[in-house]
């Protein structure tokens, strides 16, 4: 009997303890399980990100843009709610905000970190990236972290992941030291490397490629880590409607081509990097473009003036006296026939050339079938600007004959090189064309346009908010690393 009483007492105590322990967890689980409902009730999806040239930025027209913004906006539309963006300084700030329910999703080209598996949920991977050690071109290129000396200035942004990587290396290499600057973004540190203010930083490979388009002095020494999946982070929960909704959205985005279109918009141009070309171009942005900016703005019409400027650079490198062996002339490199059609008499007059080039490009846009999405018509028009309207229509026909969608720019552009292959052009109305050149032509213009946008964005940001000094940072040495 005594044993039974003891067992009952113990069982009762355990039951009370279990109730006491489980009840708050039930509240937490209930709260987490209702995270999706909370978003629906408030009518807003709150996404945390980082302001840079890939994830999120305000474009020259004052509109939000960036890969993570476009993807987040599409997901918010899928949920039937508004999107609220919270821009934070670094990944640690994002994870802290997510942990404290200040944001619903963290999205900033974040690499997969297994150690966060219990704290957060992972969304589907949509690309991959690695951590890279970056230095200034022209200086000695280190081959490994062991080649960094105590006098080298390695500065990183606030990142627990990077701190763990470097701390592990420091155990094998006691002389390794670095600074953590919580005031500067990853992009800002990359710019400081380019300007020679610091020796090295470590950055996400996606952000490195983007920064190189405006600061070609940025060079990659080596990858610190292997490539890892990039995905969104969500609040942790034993059951999550939000994660299920995101999975369904991402599956649909892959099937309908949304992911491919967003990646093409923000990634295709940064995949190409030619130091000499980009260096010459950024010099031209500084020294030559200001001479013609007013004219590009005056005659931009329905176009972004930066796109018109990019076309002119691709055509003539902003040389109003340019002449080719085939007879095209001027800053927009117009043929005599096009000049006559646009009713100008001096192709080497910059204003006449820019005006005619813009009007001709607008006319080409009007010739693109209305079945093509409005935002993609410009790429078809640029293809026609380069190789002729007939060949542009030919590549649409070819795409359809190969089972593709002629209204999908991604499918059409990959078929452009086929216009130079006899088995294909022999069956087309307008015959042979250097389609591979047209492909590169459009890619270059997109890259040049984005470089102008980001060059001015960085410049304006530095003017309005001068970079904090590198000395405003925490120095990590072997001694305080072990404390």
Curated annotation (Swiss-Prot):
Membrane topology designation? Peripheral membrane protein
Q: What keywords were assigned to this record?
A: Cell outer membrane, Cell wall biogenesis/degradation, Lyase, Membrane, Signal
> Which N-terminal residues, if any, form the signal peptide?
1-18
**Protein's GO biological process:** cell wall macromolecule catabolic process; cell wall organization; peptidoglycan catabolic process
State the reactions this protein catalyses: Exolytic cleavage of the (1->4)-beta-glycosidic linkage between N-acetylmuramic acid (MurNAc) and N-acetylglucosamine (GlcNAc) residues in peptidoglycan, from either the reducing or the non-reducing ends of the peptidoglycan chains, with concomitant formation of a 1,6-anhydrobond in the MurNAc residue
List the PANTHER family.
Answer: MEMBRANE-BOUND LYTIC MUREIN TRANSGLYCOSYLASE F
The free-text domain remark for this protein reads: The N-terminal domain does not have lytic activity and probably modulates enzymatic activity. The C-terminal domain is the catalytic active domain.
Instruction: Specify the protein name.
Output: Membrane-bound lytic murein transglycosylase F
Give the source species: Actinobacillus succinogenes (strain ATCC 55618 / DSM 22257 / CCUG 43843 / 130Z)
């Amino acid at each position: 009997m005594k044993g039974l009483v003891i067992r009952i007492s113990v069982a009762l105590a355990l039951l009370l303890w279990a109730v006491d322990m489980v009840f708050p967890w039930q509240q937490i689980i209930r709260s987490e399980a209702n995270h999706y409902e909370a978003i629906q009730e408030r009518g807003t999806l709150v996404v945390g990100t980082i302001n840079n040239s890939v994830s999120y930025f305000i474009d020259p027209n004052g509109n939000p843009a960036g890969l993570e913004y476009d993807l987040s906006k599409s997901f918010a539309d899928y949920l039937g709610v508004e999107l609220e963006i919270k821009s934070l300084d670094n990944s640690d700030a994002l994870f802290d905000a997510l942990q404290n329910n200040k944001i619903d999703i963290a999205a900033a080209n974040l690499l997969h970190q297994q150690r966060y598996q219990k704290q957060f949920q992972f969304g589907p991977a949509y690309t991959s990236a690695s951590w890279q050690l970056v230095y200034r071109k022209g200086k000695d290129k280190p081959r490994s972290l062991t080649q960094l000396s105590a006098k080298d200035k390695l500065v990183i942004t606030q990142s627990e992941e990077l701190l763990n990587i470097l701390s592990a290396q420091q155990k094998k290499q006691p002389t390794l030291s670095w600074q953590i600057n919580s005031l500067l973004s990853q992009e800002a540190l990359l710019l400081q490397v380019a300007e020679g203010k610091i020796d090295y930083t470590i950055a996400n490979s996606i952000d490195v490629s983007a920064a190189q388009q405006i600061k070609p002095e940025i060079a990659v020494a080596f990858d610190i880590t292997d490539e890892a999946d990039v995905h969104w982070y969500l609040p942790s929960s034993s059951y999550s409607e939000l994660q299920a909704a995101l999975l369904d959205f991402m599956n649909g985005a892959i099937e309908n081509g949304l992911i491919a279109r967003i990646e093409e918009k923000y990634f295709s141009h940064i995949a190409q990097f030619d130091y000499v070309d980009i260096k010459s171009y950024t010099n031209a942005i500084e020294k030559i473009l200001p001479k013609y900016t007013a004219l590009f703005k005056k005659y931009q019409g329905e176009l972004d003036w930066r796109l018109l400027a990019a076309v002119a650079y691709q055509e003539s490198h902003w040389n109003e006296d340019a002449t080719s062996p085939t007879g095209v002339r001027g800053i927009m490199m117009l043929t005599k026939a096009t000049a006559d059609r646009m009713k100008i008499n001096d192709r080497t007059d910059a204003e006449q050339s820019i005006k005619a080039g813009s009007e001709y490009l607008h006319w080409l846009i009007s010739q693109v079938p209305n079945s093509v999405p409005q935002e993609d018509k410009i790429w078809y028009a640029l293809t026609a600007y380069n190789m002729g309207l007939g060949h542009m229509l030919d590549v649409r026909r070819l795409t359809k004959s190969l089972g593709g969608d002629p209204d999908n720019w991604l499918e059409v552009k990959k078929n452009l090189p086929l216009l130079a292959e006899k088995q294909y052009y022999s069956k087309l109305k307008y015959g042979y064309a250097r389609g591979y050149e047209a492909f590169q032509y459009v890619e270059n213009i997109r890259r040049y346009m984005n470089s102008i946008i980001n060059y001015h964005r960085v410049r304006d940001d530095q003017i309005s908010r001068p970079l904090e000094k590198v000395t405003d940072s925490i120095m990590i040495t072997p001694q305080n690393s072990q404390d």
